């Protein structure tokens, strides 16, 4: 079995309040080590909230996003194992947009013959 490490970036932009939307979902032979979840509120007047869950457990719960600002949601690496789902929910007025940026390491186990 070979192990392949890939350093990746994933970005998502939303302009509406949404609930339990999948962000990242590693396959069963993958493990994601998330280094950064950076969220940007592009509104000059609205302060929506965001929650992040990892397999139904809150990583961040109802984080208020300041106007025209970015915030780092995690301070330590976060492990997302294969077969689980990292999701987000937004609430409030999100019409100007909220960007979610994730930097992570994908550890992929490949079977070689």
Regions found by a protein language model. Give the residues of each.
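Exposed aromatic-hydrophobic patches
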Residues: 70-77
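Noncatalytic modules at the cell exterior or secretory-pathway interfaces
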Residues: 77-96
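Short, surface-exposed beta-strand/strand-loop-strand elements in extracellular ectodomains
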Residues: 43-63
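Serine/threonine-rich, low-complexity intrinsically disordered segments
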Residues: 16-17, 55, 66
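Surface-exposed loop/turn positions
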Residues: 30, 69, 82-84, 98
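C-terminal interaction-tip segments
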Residues: 1-32, 36, 40, 90-113
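Short proline/glycine- and polar residue-rich coil/turn motifs
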Residues: 64-70
């Amino acid at each position: 079995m070979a192990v392949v490490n890939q350093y990746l970036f994933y970005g998502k932009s939303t302009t509406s309040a949404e609930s339990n939307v999948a962000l990242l979902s590693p396959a069963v032979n993958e493990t994601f080590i998330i280094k950064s979840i950076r969220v940007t509120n592009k509104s000059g007047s609205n302060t929506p909230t965001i929650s992040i869950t990892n397999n139904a457990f809150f990583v961040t719960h109802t984080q208020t996003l300041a106007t025209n600002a970015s915030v780092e949601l995690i301070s330590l690496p976060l492990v997302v194992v294969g077969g689980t789902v990292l999701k987000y929910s937004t609430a409030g007025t999100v019409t100007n947009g909220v960007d979610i940026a994730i930097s992570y390491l994908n550890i992929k186990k490949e079977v070689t013959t």
